[in-house]
Amino acid sequence: MGSMAQKSVLMLCGEFMEAYETIVPLYVLQAFGVSVHCVSPGRKTGDKCVMAAHDLLGLEIYTELVVDHLTLNANFDGVIPDQYDAIIIPGGRFTELLSADEKCVSLVARFAELKKLIFTSCHSQLFLAAAGLLTGGMKCTAFESMKPFIELSGGAWWQQPGVQTLFEITDCVKDGSFMSTMGWPTLGHSLKVLLESLGSKISSSKENHQTSLLFLIGDCVEDYSINVPFKAFQALGCKVDAVTPTKKRGEKCATIVHDLEDGRQLPTEKFGHNFYVTVAWDDVSVDDYDCIVVPGGRSPELLVMNPKAVELVRKFVEKGKFVAAIGMGNWLLAATGALKKKRCASSYGTKVAVKVAGGEIVESERCVTDDKLVTAASTSDLPAFLYALSTALGLSVVF
């Protein structure tokens, strides 16, 4: 899996950008060989932008929770639009500030002039309105509070038909070189459209077989280590489910994000987006899936105390299925025998567990594949993890 001619994408960033709408496309594109430059006006390489999670937490409007930071890897002033295949603008409050910034609006307008792909999400459609790009009835969707401004700007509001709730929305709309989404709940499908729009070919080595993955989670699962691979494998056309022993289909699991703040030995834990269980425990059959994935966070510590969870992983191992873990996910795998005599990646938090379970830690590698076991040390290793696990499952993305 790889890229014959490397694609390059620009991501326009700012304070309080939506974390999920930033990290998911960033890591997925990086996993499949796309270069992504993250920039913000007035800031340079190495500077940081605060990211926030936006979710419905029982109030009439979404709640904003500061979660962590993104480190910029390029300079805004050095951007040459001709050198990129697309621009991605996540949602979040920074869009209100930067959509009034002449340099940012001109940048977006230049991408439109070059007919480069412009990917907007949630509230970042403000840039399209500011640049006068919606005139003539261009089809556009966004978070519903944006509807009046899209229509006042000459755009044609598009909404996925037949949905009753916000979280039933899974689709996006593309009109020419403009692509818009309601927000992070739609990322599985919108990433598929994004990859295809960049010229990718997604294929599987197994003809007439839909690859299927089961994510084993619980409360305090790490936000990115469930959301990034879950949406990534949806984008690759896989059947993807999430299950937990103690909750029904449609119920929520709280997620957490670990943010390493200056001067601290360990990261600060913060709440992230809620994640919805997609399948009931009693409806899960090991034979229906090719792989089980145990994300990180503190949920593995919860699951290791539940005999049902331990036995489920053990059944995947016994049946020769693929088993994968991220970060603290090794904690649960250690209790199932999945790590015995296996090479694996490990964070400091699971080194003792891996060793006493008979595993071999590969200190020099952040993501390791050993036969049908794929492990990543931390969430920052998710691009490598996505590449390794998709390759192991016979999936390829070629540009």
Curated annotation (Swiss-Prot):
What is the species of this protein?
Arabidopsis thaliana (Mouse-ear cress)
Q: Which SUPFAM superfamilies match?
A: Class I glutamine amidotransferase-like (SSF52317)
Enumerate the spans annotated as PfpI endopeptidase domain.
7-199, 211-394
Keyword annotations from UniProtKB, A to Z: Repeat, Stress response
Q: What is this protein called?
A: DJ-1 protein homolog F
Question: What assembly does the database describe for this protein?
Answer: Homotrimer.
Function noted in UniProt: May be involved in oxidative stress response.
A Pfam family this chain is assigned to:
DJ-1_PfpI
CDD domains to which the protein is assigned, alphabetical: GATase1_PfpI_1 (cd03169)
What GO terms fall under cellular component here?
cytosol
The entry sums up its family as follows: Belongs to the peptidase C56 family.
